[in-house]
């Protein structure tokens, strides 16, 4: 019987591509449209450097002028100014020992797909944790006065009224919000109250909704002292682009480990950009070449750039 060698599978170029594809298709953040792949962001992620300026035109304002038949009356043009966001590239990796990998392969016709699914599932969870940490950072200061609805002082639980008051933070731009991310405890409470609806999609896949918002359940949502954090998002509120590590997947064998029994290690690497639109990464307290989760969650590393109504993220704090 032929033996499947891990090294013969993971060194194939299509393996890393398969892991990348699975990690996004499995993610509710991607499937809901909250995180949107952007070719321009992907081009930056594939280029050299760690931080990138994203220029944009500031909105224009002012009132129209009244026409005149006096040729000496001249209109004064207003300025059209340009500013920029700043995105940061994330360099992330992980590794697993052969014991776990070998056991997980088991029997089957497609061990490559089995390994790819395992690693992709891990990347899906890890990328969601990364995003939650970034949200913690931007709401700690940059968006704290404009995009946060806090009802913890009144000991109010998450409800329809709380969410509707939260979306009002964007005023007449609130219709741009389409999904809500919440802790499983809050999701279960809404289920008990029979407030969750299930909408069918292609392939008979059903997903939960609340007040018309698609619900994404993630226990990475902060919970502190009985205070739960939920987030309202609009489509494309987080831009995403995948880079190209020199060696995305690597297999190592240490024949002397275990007193000669040998040890196998599988390493996976990703370079990508997760950028909340309308924010600037300042790097004010970043120590290394790429931010840690703690640094992403640090208030001073983010600055608000866009007008309030253009930033399609709202934080809700409730009991």
Spans of model-derived segments:
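Alpha-helical scaffold segments that mediate packing/assembly in large oligomeric complexes
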Residues: 101-172, 290-318
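Extended, solvent-exposed, turn-rich assembly/linker loops in the middle of proteins
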Residues: 140-218
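Short, catalytically relevant binding-site loops at active-site mouths
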Residues: 186-188, 221-223, 272-273, 280
């Amino acid at each position: 019987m032929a033996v499947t060698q891990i090294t013969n599978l993971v060194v194939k170029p299509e393996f890393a591509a398969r892991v990348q594809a699975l990690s996004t298709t499995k993610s509710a953040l991607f499937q809901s449209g909250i995180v949107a792949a952007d070719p321009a962001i992907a081009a930056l992620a594939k280029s050299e450097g760690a931080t990138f300026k994203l220029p944009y035109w500031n909105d224009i304002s002012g009132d129209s002028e009244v026409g005149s038949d006096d040729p000496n009356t001249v209109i004064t043009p207003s300025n059209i100014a340009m500013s920029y966001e700043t995105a940061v590239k994330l360099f992330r990796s992980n590794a697993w020992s052969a014991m776990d990998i070998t056991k997980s392969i088991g029997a089957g016709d497609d061990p490559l797909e089995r390994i790819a699914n395992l690693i992709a599932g891990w990347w899906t969870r890890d990328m969601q944790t990364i995003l939650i940490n970034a949200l913690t950072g931007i709401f700690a200061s940059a968006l704290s006065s404009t995009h946060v609805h806090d009802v913890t002082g009144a000991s109010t639980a998450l409800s329809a009224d709380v969410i509707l008051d939260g979306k009002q933070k964007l005023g007449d731009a609130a219709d741009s919000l389409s999904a809500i991310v919440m802790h499983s405890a809050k999701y279960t409470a809404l289920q008990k109250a029979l407030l969750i609806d299930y909408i069918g999609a292609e392939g008979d896949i059903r997903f939960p909704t609340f007040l018309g918002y698609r619900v994404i359940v993630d226990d990475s949502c902060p919970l502190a002292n009985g205070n739960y954090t939920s987030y309202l998002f609009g489509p494309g509120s987080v831009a995403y682009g995948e880079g190209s590590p020199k060696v995305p997947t690597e297999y190592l064998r240490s024949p002397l480990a275990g007193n000669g029994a040998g040890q196998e290690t599988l390493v996976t690497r990703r370079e990508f950009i997760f950028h909340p639109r309308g924010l600037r990464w300042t790097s004010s307290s970043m120590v290394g070449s790429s931010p840690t989760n703690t640094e992403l969650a640090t208030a001073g590393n983010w600055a608000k750039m866009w007008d309030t109504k253009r930033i399609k993220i709202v934080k809700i704090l409730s009991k």
